[in-house]
Amino acid sequence: MAYVIGIDIGTSALKTLVVNKSGDVVESYSVSYNTAHPKSGYSEIDPEIWYEATLESLKYILNHYTHNDLTGISFSGQMHGLVVIDQEGNPIRPAILWNDTRTSQEVEDIKKNLGLNSLLQLTQNTVLEGFTLPKLMWLKNHEQDNYKRIYKFMLPKDYIVYKLTGNVYTEPSDAAGTIMFSVKDENWSTELLHRLNIDPSICPEIIASHQKSGQLTEKVKNTLGIDSNINVYQGGANNACGALGSGITDEQKQLVSIGTSGVALSIENSTDYENDGNVHYFNHCVPNQKYIMGVTLSAGYSLEWLKQLISADENFTTFLKDINQSEVGANGLMYTPYLLGERTPHNDASVRGSFIGLDANTTQLDMKRAVIEGITYSINESIHIMKNNAININEIVSIGGGAKNNQWLQIQADIFNTTITTRTEEQGPAYGAAMIAAMGEQWFNTFNEMSEAWIAYHQKVYPIETNTKSYQDLFNIYKTIYD
């Protein structure tokens, strides 16, 4: 029996899956770790922690499966992080993560130096504090000695691939999130690099997500106690892998993922599409596919915040049990989920959240429902941008915490006015990484073929017409609050 391994390098944990040729997850393993916050707004980690977590996971898997049966490994990784290595291949400093916000001045400088229109033309995206380019410019401005030592920069998953194989690559889905990459040309923007005086040689070579990066080095094999070769494939960005693992391989379905943040994602392959900066426009890990993505920064984070305020000891199932006792519209209460600012469509780091319509009759159930509705309204702003771009949205695959509560699934169907589908067995981005490894191993001819064979769906939730009409009016009110 042959197996592939998918590994997701998350912010707080590394998750590993073993998948057989039928697409069944036969083993999983997780390793948790902590990030460092040495100053306000800073978020860092020693990249060797990811590598040690990877080795621990592989040792666990190898204790349960014959290494000759494990034929391929691939990765999903958190986007936008900056890892820099020197000529000897050693990390120069801790990795700066996606949720690090120290780069506000660099963002303004980049916009001033390039101009927003030029930036959109060169990369098809705007620049934000969490992205890789301003982190690199921050190093240039604040740690000049470290900047001068840079041999290559990498994204988090690419560093692990490098440690396992000795080869430095990245691929389009992660490169797009650096804002140094032309999404349409699928290569580094040499003009942008030149205008910002960044040496192009520090950029890793681009290969396809399912292209072979190499094999485990002899040093790694000795550490793991094996002698067989295992192929390593480059992998993809976490959102791309999450979409792939949910069956989003073409324009037929869209994705909504509600975790700490919320994501709405749709394939967008029109050659005429021009991003105005309100959404992200990135390359998929599926060849020749691109997607647009809107982000709600405080999705599940908002619900966790409310739970800690009013019922910290309850689990989420109990916390949300009776929210249908509050009517559509939460009895006149509305919530804006701007606890950490907002991404789509406002790109506003300073705006803050609010409850509107509180009165003496407001109940805890009203507050719970208002928060869920507010999160879903925010994601619906991204859905509306997609609809305005002539994307035909007939079915949305919902994953994450928002898919684990039937009442919230109904609210999604009603607010989005679209059929909501859930996965039979949701495994997150690590499953998409395993699919990339399987494609690299040539188990299938296309990702569509693999998706049809491997991806199963659990239930469909349909919009209720009377609820949808009410939510359309409420959503129009919601959109006026920011203005």
UniProtKB/Swiss-Prot annotation:
CDD domains in UniProt: ASKHA_NBD_FGGY_EcXK-like (cd07808)
Organism name: Staphylococcus xylosus
EC number: 2.7.1.17
Reactions that this protein is recorded to catalyse: D-xylulose + ATP = D-xylulose 5-phosphate + ADP + H(+)
InterPro entries membership: ATPase_NBD, Carb_kinase_FGGY, Carb_kinase_FGGY_CS, FGGY_C, FGGY_Carb_Kinase, FGGY_N, Xylulokinase
Catalytic EC class: transferase
Protein name: Xylulose kinase
Binding locations of substrate: 79-80
Function: Catalyzes the phosphorylation of D-xylulose to D-xylulose 5-phosphate.
UniProt lineage: Bacteria, Bacillati, Bacillota, Bacilli, Bacillales
Alphabetic keyword roster: ATP-binding, Carbohydrate metabolism, Kinase, Nucleotide-binding, Transferase, Xylose metabolism
SUPFAM superfamilies, sorted: Actin-like ATPase domain (SSF53067)
